[in-house]
Every structure is written in structure tokens, then in C-alpha cells.
A protein has these predicted regions:
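A cross-family phosphate/adenosyl-ligand binding-site feature
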Residues: 1-119, 124-213, 217-397
């Protein structure tokens, strides 16, 4: 995902410095060219050799290191950078850079970088809330630097409050948003639905399905990484929502209908990946239905057909993509859905094909439009999401 991208990690003197080893490793696994710069104080918390081992690149600390290469190191590395993250960012380094001071390898390199720079402050709550530090953060924001709001929690000093550096997984998402893909969906509003719905029988039981929401969440994340403004309408799932995506949680088919139709006219692209119940109990018991020896039956009624509604109310220039999960006659049933519901594309899969079912991390899709059918091989759901977006972009140019 980051192949061909250069990421600079600036580490300052903080106990949170050890966490950046996990971030450096994760970036390297995504094929980024990772370069680590440390302040002298940072080396008291973690050894530079750790980062050299994880990244395969020399860890830079001394501005005047005799590396015997005919280049000015801090300028050379700055020119290569696609994104810079200073994490943990101490009050000292925040103050230096906010006021134009550059007296070591890290600060001089940051000053020379023209790419996006992201700071992740880590310090005691009283230091973070100090008016001088807050003023310096405002200065960084004014100059176009991004400063991540620190988390609140138990700090190394024993206090509890704001000042905790976000976890490496969160920091990685900031870097991916900035550098993973070209922003070919910039300026577009994308609505994605994901997950199952739950239709109550009584306060204890419900009708639902096996959808995990993974495919829809992957589409939402990839669209965001490609620059779109993404709204995700999600049924109940166990998945952590992607950062930088507006999430509208829902439970029932009626909830999803109301959430989707409430924002659909504002969208450029709608991708409906949710597995919405076709039927719901006609009557919902206020109390738990007790079992007995007799056979039980539940009278059902149709739910609102969200995709049909969207097709009937599609605005000019809006792209509408549906999903079709089949067990037989996949192409025929999906093409009928495309025509009947006025869709621009259907992403179809067959539950009986290995790797294409619910819950898993892979999918096998066929992208069906008015003019063609494109069969995709087995791939991760994130890669499948990218293929869906590629196709949509090609059809909307």
C-alpha cells in the first residue's frame, strides 16, 4: 500500500518513544521506505539500532554525522519525504518548530520538508494544557501542520488526563490517509452501507443474517484514503469504524432506510454493501416470548427496498452500485437487479465459491454493468474495494 513512498518518523524525548518501533515495523511491512530521525533525548528512551533493524535505514541523530556521502543529509532526506510524522512530539520540539528554531537533525529536516507534517503530542496534562504550548500548537496549525489531539488516560507520571500519544495503529491511519493513494476521489461525496440489520421479534430475539460488514467497511476506508468525503451507514458489527469517516450506526432496515435517504441526495457515489433484511416481524412482542410445546410461527412483512428507492430517486450524475449475494444464477439474477432497480453497477458474488462468503477477509466478485461483466479473482476485501472504486472512477470520467 505504501510501496514507493518515503515516510519520515521524528522521535523526541518521551517514554512513548518505544511505541514508534511498532509503527516503523508496520510501515516497513507495507513496503514504505522508512527513515527515522531522533533527538538526543529520544535516544535515552530507545536505542537507534532498534529502528535501523526494523527499517533497514540508518537512524539519523547527529546533523554533522560524517556519512561520507556527497549530500546534505537533512535536505536530501527532506526532498524524498512523502509525509513526516513527529511522534511522540514533546513540548520542547513543538515549541522549536512553531517558532522557526532548527538546531538538530530532526528540526532542520522538518523545516526543509515541503510535504505534510503531522505531530502527535505526548506529555503531562499540565504541560499540554499550558497556554504557551497551546499557543505553539495553534501556530503549527496556522502554518499548515496537522496536530493530533492526544488521548486521555493514565500517563507515565501517574496522572490521568490529556497528553497520551495515540496508539501506533491510529498513527498509521494518519500516514495512510496522507500517502497511501493518489486522491482521485477528492471532492467526491461517497455513501457506503455495510453490515447486517436486526429485526426485533421480542426484547431478546431478532431476525438477522451472517454479514460481518467487512466488505462495506473496506470500501469506506479505501474511498477515504483516495480522498473522498465518506459517510458510512452501518448495521451492528464488531468492526472498529475507520478513522476520518462519518459513521451513522443503525439497527433495523427501517433505521437504515431513514439514515440513507436522509443523506442520499447529497452524494456523488452510493455503494450499498449492507445485507438488509427483506422481511421483519409484523408484530413485535413487548415481552419475551416464552417457549412451549406447540409449534411457533411469526408473521412477516416486507421491509422498505432501499436500493429500489435510490434507483427511483437517483439524481443526474449520481452513481449507484449495489451488491448481490447469490447461490445460483449469479449473473442472471444480478443483471435483473441492475435493470429493475436502475443501478449503474452490481458487485456480485456467489456464496458457494470458496473465499467469497460472509465473515471472511477475502472475496471473489464479478462487476456487472450495462455493457460488461468483469470477473475478479480471489483477493482481500481491501483489494476488492479498490477494484470497485477503480471501476466506478473509470465509468464516471
Amino acid at each position: 500500500m505504501l510501496k514507493g513512498k518515503t515516510v519520515l518518523l521524528g522521535i523526541t524525548g518521551s517514554i512513548a518513544a518505544y511505541k514508534i518501533a511498532y509503527l516503523a515495523s508496520a510501515l516497513h511491512k507495507l513496503h514504505a521506505d522508512v527513515h527515522v530521525l531522533m533527538t538526543e533525548n529520544a535516544t535515552n528512551f530507545i536505542n537507534p539500532i532498534t529502528f535501523e533493524t526494523l527499517t533497514g535505514n540508518k537512524c539519523l541523530v547527529d546533523t554533522f554525522d560524517r556519512n561520507f556521502q556527497f549530500q546534505v543529509e537533512h535536505v536530501s532526506i527532506a526532498k524524498k519525504a512523502d509525509v513526516v510524522m513527529i511522534a511522540p512530539a514533546s513540548a520542547n520540539v513543538i515549541g522549536k518548530i512553531a517558532n522557526g528554531l532548527a538546531d538538530d537533525m530532526l528540526t532542520t529536516t522538518v523545516m526543509a520538508c515541503r510535504c505534510q507534517k503531522i505531530f502527535a503530542p505526548a506529555m503531562n496534562t499540565a504541560m499540554y494544557e499550558n497556554p504557551i504550548v497551546q499557543d505553539n500548537i495553534r501556530k503549527l496549525n496556522h502554518y499548515g501542520y496537522e496536530v493530533i489531539t492526544p488521548a486521555s488516560g493514565y500517563l507515565a507520571c501517574g496522572d490521568t488526563g490529556a497528553g497520551k500519544m495515540p496508539e501506533p495503529e491510529t498513527l498509521l491511519e494518519y500516514i495512510l490517509r496522507e500517502a497511501a493513494f493518489e486522491k482521485d476521489l477528492s471532492g467526491k461525496k461517497v455513501l457506503v452501507t455495510a453490515g447486517p440489520t436486526q429485526e426485533a421479534i421480542d426484547p431478546v430475539r431478532c431476525l438477522t443474517n451472517h454479514s460481518s460488514g467487512k466488505m462495506g467497511y473496506a470500501i469506506a476506508k479505501m474511498a477515504m484514503l483516495r480522498g473522498a468525503e465518506v459517510t458510512l451507514v452501518s448495521g451492528p458489527t464488531a468492526i472498529e469504524p475507520p478513522l476520518f469517516v462519518k459513521v451513522l450506526p443503525v439497527t433495523s432496515a427501517r433505521d437504515m432506510f431513514e439514515a440513507v435517504t436522509g443523506v442520499s441526495d447529497q452524494q456523488d457515489i452510493i455503494i450499498k454493501a449492507a445485507a438488509v433484511a427483506d422481511y421483519r416481524p409484523k408484530q413485535v412482542s413487548e415481552d419475551k416470548v416464552k417457549k412451549n410445546d406447540d409449534q411457533a410461527s411469526i408473521e412477516l412483512e416486507r421491509t422498505d427496498d432501499i436500493l429500489k428507492y435510490l434507483g427511483q430517486h437517483k439524481k443526474d450524475g449520481q452513481f449507484l452500485c449495489g451488491f448481490s449475494m447469490e447461490t445460483k444464477n449469479m449473473i442472471g439474477n444480478s443483471r435483473a437487479k441492475l435493470e429493475k432497480k436502475n443501478l449503474d453497477m452490481v458487485a456480485a458474488n456467489n456464496l458457494k465459491v470458496e473465499g467469497a462468503g460472509f465473515q471472511g477477509d477475502t472475496n471473489v466478485l464479478t462487476l456487472i454493468t450495462q455493457d460488461e461483466e468483469v470477473s475478479l479473482p480471489l483477493m482481500s476485501k481491501e483489494d476488492a474495494a479498490l477494484k470497485i472504486l477503480d471501476k466506478i472512477i473509470s465509468l464516471t470520467k
